[in-house]
Amino acid sequence: MADSCCIRLHLLASVFLLLFSSFNLQGIAAENLSKQKLTSLILQNEIVKEVNENPNAGWKAAFNDRFANATVAEFKRLLGVIQTPKTAYLGVPIVRHDLSLKLPKEFDARTAWSHCTSIRRILVGYILNNVLLWSTITLWFWFLLGHCGSCWAFGAVESLSDRFCIKYNLNVSLSANDVIACCGLLCGFGCNGGFPMGAWLYFKYHGVVTQECDPYFDNTGCSHPGCEPTYPTPKCERKCVSRNQLWGESKHYGVGAYRINPDPQDIMAEVYKNGPVEVAFTVYEDFAHYKSGVYKYITGTKIGGHAVKLIGWGTSDDGEDYWLLANQWNRSWGDDGYFKIRRGTNECGIEQSVVAGLPSEKNVFKGITTSDDLLVSSV
């Protein structure tokens, strides 16, 4: 009875989210950009100059190799967070923490839980004979001018992977492909964008398999979203590629799905107590040029919505409070794949869309793999 009730609620939630989001399939800030704008290059000398000559910018801009020759349209396709109306969060709890909790002035999940390799895992992609090969699995990944807007799924699976290690000492990498392909309308539209909260609800109701069970590549070469222009959402297969794993046994579950109260103290307390969280924010043109420092919007057009993993906080030498985040665009982007953004001012909306959930012990102690053989950490 309880299971059937959950299924009905799940279906109602799916229809609800579809009705409230069908008007907008391309990110938090899906701007109607002109054809001329979309075909122009995302990296611009004017933006680099304006940021670097601004004494109050607080960060440095550069031509990141990851976006060399990329157009605005190609960059925009990587921003897969769909705007979710506030009404779609009805029934989703908002977590607040005890304000008396003493928090450190600086915190970095990579050092706080140094035994958890998933927290600091970085991807390195190479092009060989027009085939994208992977040397590691990451912070998520850069589709290299691929066209799958799935940051919403990667932000979720990477954060939950970290939380499994923190709570159960289980170094595991969970499958974004499972979420993108099998979550359905509860999560949104797969490669055409999705809801971060939907992914966490999927973990609760259906669980998510490991990267080893459902990876982003096969023995024939590149088969993950992004290898081809306009790659469609992958088909939900519900079977592991690894012969020694069963789909159901590979599932890892979440306990609940919740939003964190948009107060810096609550967000910091959540990360400090439970591990990294998924955050969504609005991306402008200048963000593609980020190299170092504490980012805040300076110049450029609004492009779309992006989801990343928040792993810590601190204060710069200039006295600027910041959040520390892991992006999905490889080590050649930003500060070795990471970036800092201004904390306490809801910069680009980053403090108002923080979501997470707790890991469940279901299936954890059944002898399933505790590390994916397909993964090689790059730290």
Swiss-Prot record:
Residues 1-30 form the signal peptide. CDD domains: Peptidase_C1A_CathepsinB. GO terms for biological process: defense response; proteolysis. Its EC number is 3.4.22.-. It comes from the Eukaryota. InterPro entries: Papain-like_cys_pep_sf, Pept_his_AS, Peptidase_C1A, Peptidase_C1A_C, Propeptide_C1A. Glycans are attached at residues 32, 69, 171, 330. Disulfide bonds join 116-165, 148-191, 182-236, 183-187, 213-240, 222-227. Keywords: Disulfide bond, Glycoprotein, Hydrolase, Plant defense, Protease, Signal, Thiol protease. PANTHER family: CYSTEINE PROTEASE FAMILY C1-RELATED (PTHR12411). This is Cathepsin B-like protease 1. It comes from Arabidopsis thaliana.
